[in-house]
Amino acid sequence: MSDILDKIIAVKREEIAAALESAPLEELKVQASARDSRDFVGALRDKHAAGHAAVIAEVKKASPSKGVLREHFVPADIARSYAQHGAACLSVLTDERFFQGSARYLEQARAACALPVLRKDFIVDAYQVLEARAMGADAILLIAAALDTPLMIDLEAYAHSLGLAVLVEVHNRGELDEALKLKTPLVGINNRNLRTFETTIDTTLGMLDAIPDDRIVVTESGILSRADVERMEAAGVHTFLVGEAFMRAENPGAELARMFF
């Protein structure tokens, strides 16, 4: 199979070049400074302290591997449904080319509820970090497979300077070793291989022994049932990023409650 991640990164670099023309850095800085901030990490810890799973509920219309997940897609309604049914935070896809996402979707979802919001995208440049703050994100995703370690460290530092939390995502032990050089407590283990899009939740279970106790493990992708949730919780994982299972349900928030609470 062709390397999907490399294709996505190449497109991101093209998008950044175009965005710099249409929305210069100084303009973005003004927009970013006007945004309020919600505590992403704190929202997860509050759920843990109350004895609940912390669910980062995803607002996602489509994916390259599965196509359109939800035809009737209204981000504000989905966000409200998640908030009403116990989500800790939101994750909103902003990639347009591959996931049919949009910055507008993030803005609409955040305006509809009080939950902190993660910008889910393929970030490879500081411009996108500032862009995330300007659109209202409270956290960004850094994907270890897409970044070398010095750049990842620099992007994290810039994000923190803007008041953004960082979720660093890994898929194997080599990436984990590099991710642990960051300061963020949030370590996401993606059960989906971003180079092949194959998925198994054993990926998370096989890496837990290498993660320090002071980090919050976020299991991502492939959590599709209550049985998957119970398997993770039995292994000590209590933070989940889930999209597909909710997006395919008639009522995303009700499905969240059914799976987790």
Swiss-Prot record:
Listed CDD domains: IGPS
Reactions catalysed: 1-(2-carboxyphenylamino)-1-deoxy-D-ribulose 5-phosphate + H(+) = (1S,2R)-1-C-(indol-3-yl)glycerol 3-phosphate + CO2 + H2O
GO molecular function terms listed in the Swiss-Prot or TrEMBL record: indole-3-glycerol-phosphate synthase activity; phosphoribosylanthranilate isomerase activity
Keyword field contains Amino-acid biosynthesis: yes
One GO biological process term: L-tryptophan biosynthetic process
EC number: 4.1.1.48
Pathway(s) it belongs to: Amino-acid biosynthesis; L-tryptophan biosynthesis; L-tryptophan from chorismate: step 4/5
HAMAP family (alphabetical): IGPS_B
Protein family according to the UniProt entry: Belongs to the TrpC family.
This protein's name: Indole-3-glycerol phosphate synthase
Species this chain originates from: Burkholderia pseudomallei (strain K96243)
Originating gene: trpC
